[in-house]
Amino acid sequence: MASIGYVGAAGRDLVVREMGGPGSTPSSFVALTTNSGLSNYQALQFQYRRQLTRGLQSQVSYTWSHSIDNDSSDAFLVWGAPGFSDRGSSDFDVRHSLTASASYEFPRVAAAVPLGRSLRGWGMDAVLHARTGFPISVLNSEQYLGITLVNAFRPDLVFGQPLWLADSSVAGGRRLNPAAFQSTVAPHQGTLGRNAIACFGMAQVDFAARREFRLTERGRLQFRLEAFNLFNHANFADAVKYLNSPVFGESTSMLNLMLGSGSPGSGLAPILQTGGPRSLQVTLRFQF
């Protein structure tokens, strides 16, 4: 069974924080809460589902979407930029997303058949996750009215310079080109748009082998061996976006750490989350 769907959503008069800077006065900064936030989401969704046939069922889902806004979080809008100039891809925008899953139940075979009893109750599950990367805004620090505004300005985009450079010595095999960006004079924002650069995508396959043992009429014991990122595909975090950083344009960690797994207080196991290295887990579950 196949289906195609469209999803659209719009947000108006959303609450955002803007930052004014009167300079060297008793209050160097003034935070303004306004309702100038705007958002828009458009998506085309495709899905194919194969019903259970001879122990096999599968599903494939693909989404082509674009999320646009002028502020994706409760952080301040960038300095010196009216709301309309901050309009761009959302921080969490994912243009292409694919998920494919399959589940197989081994057929029941008579115990007299060789290996028949050994295969009874076994099943396998596999899931493929793949998506394009999140967008980032390149930012720089500037002096204005005697105050250092840290990572508050977008630079100018230098015409004719490639955004990315191939470099086998860095994670992902490429890094942003510093020569493609030129610092501006505060308080003016540069010509580079907000979230104009898409970073590294993600792809991984998770796999599980399981067997169920029937203990009572309603009680069952399930054994599972699970492999996360089965093929150990490297997924990298976004490139460092601060122009004055010594590692500007390079990814410095794996994706699972960027998403919060393994960070202090997150409560998440870093190796068992999306974007981490290959890891195995054995579980035993009683169902009733």
Feature annotation, model-predicted:
Residues 1-288:
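Short, solvent-exposed micro-motifs at the edges of structured domains
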